[in-house]
From Swiss-Prot:
Name of the gene: C
Designated name of the protein: Capsid protein
Region (RNA binding): 177-183
Region feature (3 X 8 AA repeats of S-P-R-R-R-[PR]-[ST]-Q): 155-177
Function: Self assembles to form an icosahedral capsid. Most capsids appear to be large particles with an icosahedral symmetry of T=4 and consist of 240 copies of capsid protein, though a fraction forms smaller T=3 particles consisting of 180 capsid proteins. Entering capsids are transported along microtubules to the nucleus. Phosphorylation of the capsid is thought to induce exposure of nuclear localization signal in the C-terminal portion of the capsid protein that allows binding to the nuclear pore complex via the importin (karyopherin-) alpha and beta.
Phosphoserine: residues carrying this PTM: 155, 162, 170
Position of sequence motif Bipartite nuclear localization signal: 158-175
Compositionally biased residues, Basic residues: 149-176
Cellular component terms (Gene Ontology): host cell; host cell cytoplasm; T=4 icosahedral viral capsid
């Protein structure tokens, strides 16, 4: 089976493959970040979002993979074979988990649309010949903040008074009128 773990989120393995392998933080750093930012939601029995669910699954799978590789490494007599197993897990599986963890943490932090926009813009940048592209790659945290998804249930605070309110009417007078209507 050819399963793309990013498909339901609007991305693809190919889109993430444009980012160099050294772009992604270590699994340990990503796990620490996930724990610091989203521990309560990840440990909650409630469903928060598909990104939380995917992150939860990735963390559990990583733990199982480490347990398995530790067991295999401890049971291999040949040091060369042991080193090959450790190297394979760190290189191949480690990169996949680093990509997966980074994607879901970034989507929760910046919003899915912003992350997809970043991946597309980075992909365009990296495929453009060096002579024709800007010297610096796009940076996720500097993309426009208009695409960041706000939490449900909270409306942004107004910075200006409502246009319906007449400025000439004093607050005291309005209170008096409202008291009269209540009686």
């Amino acid at each position: 089976m050819d399963i793309d773990p990013y498909k339901e989120f609007g991305a693809t393995v190919e889109l993430l493959s444009f980012l160099p392998s050294d772009f992604f933080p270590s699994v340990r750093d990503l796990l620490d970040t996930a724990s610091a930012l989203y521990r309560e939601a990840l440990e909650s029995p409630e469903h928060c979002s598909p990104h939380h669910t995917a992150l939860r699954q990735a963390i559990l799978c990583w733990g199982d993979l480490i347990t398995l590789s530790t067991w295999v490494g401890g049971n291999l007599e040949d040091p060369t074979s042991r080193d090959l197993v450790v190297s394979y897990v760190n290189t191949n599986m480690g990169l996949k988990f680093r990509q997966l963890l980074w994607f879901h943490i970034s989507c929760l932090t910046f919003g899915r649309e912003t992350v997809i926009e970043y991946l597309v813009s980075f992909g365009v940048w990296i495929r453009t010949p060096p002579a024709y592209r800007p010297p610096n790659a796009p940076i996720l945290s500097t993309l426009p903040e208009t695409t960041v998804v706000r939490r449900r249930g909270r409306s942004p605070r107004r910075r200006t008074p409502s246009p319906r309110r007449r400025r000439s009417q004093s607050p005291r007078r309005r209170r008096t009128q409202s008291r009269e209507s209540q009686c």
